[in-house]
Amino acid sequence: MKTWKTNLEETKQRYINWWNHKGIILSMWEHFQEGVKPHADIAPPAPARDLSQKWFDPQWRAEYLDWYVAHSSLMADMLPVANTQLGPGSLAAILGGVFEGGEDTIWIHPDPNFNDEIVFNPEHPNWLLHKELLKACKAKANGNYFVGMPDLMEGLDVLAALKGTDMVLLDTVMQSEVLEQQMQQINDIYFKVFDELYDIIREGDEMAFCYFSSWAPGKMSKLQSDISTMISQDDYRRFVQPFIREQCQKIDYTLYHLDGVGAMHHLPALLEIEELNAIQWTPGVGEPQGGSPKWYDLYK
């Protein structure tokens, strides 16, 4: 693989060091294009006809991302990677959630026909879209950049997208045993989906993730539970921790996205997961950002 990033091997080594808790990576979550000399003479596609084409036309997105990466800065440790996200938590769409394309993001609405059955349909259009998008991007990339893993998400967040957050919170009390079974079913489907998508995007054993500018020499994923801000520590250890632990045991490199001060009370449970490689901290709206001295004790 010979990418447009001239110092990729040095960046890979810094990532390997970082996964082993050594050194730092100098990067950013998104690319910037101002003042960048294009890496290749690639023209942008014609403007998207509508939001549906912008997000859900694999060929159009592949052409757009090819142009985008070709015109993006790859300085320092910024990765050459196509952002293939189909909305945060797109595993929910694979399981029946409803896509809606917005100007800047994709929304996933609850399945109006959801009946508490967690079913993976290999012919579901949203699953086929994931595969078609990644295959189109991989063909267009031609080894010049990585194709990122979409932001599938997992667990309670996926179920909340399928049936609504309020209903999932009620389930922790009203049908807790059913909820545990659903968490295992979602995890089982997650691994099937992840592995099939990994086989499309992998470069040897290596892969990149569409968010957080992440690369690893093997399977890698970002994990999270945003709904955890609304549940107790006991419920987290019952409905979240075991399934995050299973993901960390089965995926080589894992990064947990701890989002907001409301989720901080679950940090002890996260630290109990020995296989978890790293925690990414986002303080949230109205709080000083990650470099603030306010969080130094947290980092210690």
Where would I find each of the regions flagged by the language model?
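Trp/Phe/Arg-rich N-terminal binding region typifying the photolyase-homology
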Residues: Q53-W55
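Active-site loop segments of alpha/beta catalytic cores
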Residues: M1-L51, A62-E63, Y68, S72-N83, ...
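A contiguous, low-structure linker/loop signature
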Residues: V81-D116
